[in-house]
Regions:
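Short, hydrophobic beta-strand segments that form beta-sheet elements in well-ordered domains
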Residues: 32-38, 108-111, 234
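Glycine-rich hexapeptide-repeat left-handed beta-helix
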Residues: 283-405
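Conserved beta-loop-beta/alpha segment of the NTase-like Rossmann-fold superfamily
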Residues: 42-127
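Acidic, glycine-rich loop-and-beta core segments that form the ion-binding/anion-interacting portion
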Residues: 230-287, 291
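Catalytic-core segments of class I nucleotidyltransferases/pyrophosphorylases
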Residues: 101, 127-215
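N-terminal glycine-rich phosphate-binding loop and ensuing alpha1 helix
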Residues: 1-44, 50, 54-57
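Residues at the starts of beta-strands that form the adenosine-phosphate
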Residues: 31-33, 78, 106, 188
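Long, charged amphipathic helices and adjacent flexible linkers at domain junctions
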Residues: 214-232
Length: 405
């Protein structure tokens, strides 16, 4: 998700992703929650009011997370393990809890049927018994149409942690190797089929897809008493407007949308299907469409479409995000040196926190601009910009034949 520093703290309807996860866990009746984090986010996690444990080596993945909580477990404890990056409705938690209560399986794993290839773990099944796990088998090599969703109920977690230690490996699938070894040794590992909502949050466009889901939960307009709405402003549809927000003359908010605390939507501005974080300013004549803006973002005569802007981002007048290729093909983004398709023909830019972008900057579809960067005016951004960069340049015309004419 770079340049967004921690996707667990992306906000949807004013709450971080991890807060939404905790709410769903509680609604399903789970009481004791342990959050496993790294040195980079322990402080933020501790503010959530639950026990926080540090995983020293994040490269150990879920295996490391399980080992990190070992000293907090007692012999009769059961553990529900989930990934904060996989969002599921509360029904998923209730389903696995209910199934586990009458199952003699040592491990229960949520499983979801997919209709197209997903680059994750696939399970081989015999009835409800899982007979194997294949990580990223490649399209056409899937052992079934069921994928492993990281919502796992461990009935004997201390025994499984012992298995993890026996299977020590430098591979990033250490946890899955331990499950495979458990299956090989005769443990009953049960698949729990799930048909409800699920959204992995791996790439930036996944966050926008999840935002759309949260917007679908807004049933009616919710406007705080202290919000100031000009008589000539237009509010349409399912919109949440928080305390202290100001919607000025001739501004339009088209839902579903979320306007955070103390936000200013200035004259003639348009916000549609977007989240605007607290204390942000959508300045005069700006348009924000299908985007997620962090806290304290400042716009002035800008177009931001299908984009994610981190906290404390500022756009100078005339800076715009391009979100649609002229050839109408799916937008691609560079991720760790590889071009990854967004699977959509509308996707704009991702800008890291505390970045300032000058006047008349054009961000091409799929652009990434790192955190704490300065982009001077008038440039075209068509490549990945690392964190803490200063970007200045001139544009040069390159003319060649249009082979798609």
């Amino acid at each position: 998700m770079k340049p967004i520093p921690d996707k667990n703290f992306l906000k949807f309807l004013g709450k971080s992703l991890v807060e939404h996860q905790i709410e769903n866990i509680k609604k399903a009746g789970f009481e004791e929650i342990i959050i496993v984090g790294g040195a980079h986010n322990l402080g933020a996690l501790e503010k959530l009011g639950h026990k926080v444990v540090e995983q020293k080596n994040l490269d150990e993945g879920m295996a490391g997370a399980m080992m990190s909580i070992e000293s907090h477990l007692e012999a009769r404890d059961e553990v529900l393990l989930l990934s904060a990056n996989d969002y599921l409705d509360e029904d998923a938690y209730k389903l696995i809890k209910k199934t586990a209560s009458s199952s003699d399986a040592e491990l229960l794993m949520l499983a979801k049927k997919v209709t197209s290839y997903f680059p994750g773990g696939y399970i081989a099944v015999d009835g409800t018994r899982i007979t194997g796990i294949v990580e990223k088998p490649g399209e056409g090599n899937e052992p079934s149409d069921m994928i492993n969703i990281v919502l796992h109920m461990h009935k004997k977690p201390l025994e499984f942690i012992k298995k993890i230690k026996e299977c020590k490996t430098a591979n990033d699938d250490w946890y899955e190797i331990a499950i495979a070894k458990s299956i090989e040794d005769g443990s009953f590992v049960q698949a729990v089929p799930y048909e409800g909502f699920w959204q992995a949050v791996k790439y930036p466009w996944h966050a926008l897809a999840l935002q759309k889901h949260f917007f679908g939960t807004i049933k009616e307009p919710q406007i705080a008493d202290s919000a100031q709405i000009a008589d000539s402003a237009v509010i349409r549809g399912a919109v949440i407007i928080e305390e202290g927000a100001k919607i000025m003359e001739h501004a339009t908010i088209t839902g579903p949308a979320y306007i955070g605390r103390d936000v200013v939507v200035a004259n003639n501005a348009l916000v549609r299907e977007s989240e605007i974080g607290a204390q942000s300013v959508v300045g005069y004549s700006s348009e924000v469409a299908r985007s997620n803006l962090g806290n304290n973002v400042w716009l002035h005569m800008n177009y931001v479409g299908d984009s994610i802007l981190g906290d404390d981002v500022m756009l100078g007048a005339g800076a715009v995000t391009g979100n649609f290729r002229l050839d109408q093909e799916n937008v691609k983004m560079e991720v760790e040196g590889n071009k990854i398709s967004s699977q959509t023909n509308k996707f704009g830019a991702v800008v890291g926190p505390n970045t300032k972008i000058g006047i008349n900057v054009s961000m091409m579809p799929g652009s990434k601009i790192g955190a704490s960067s300065l982009i001077s005016g008038g440039v075209i951004i068509d490549k990945e910009i690392p964190d803490s960069s200063f970007v200045k340049g001139h544009n040069e015309l390159q003319i060649r034949k249009n082979n798609k004419a």
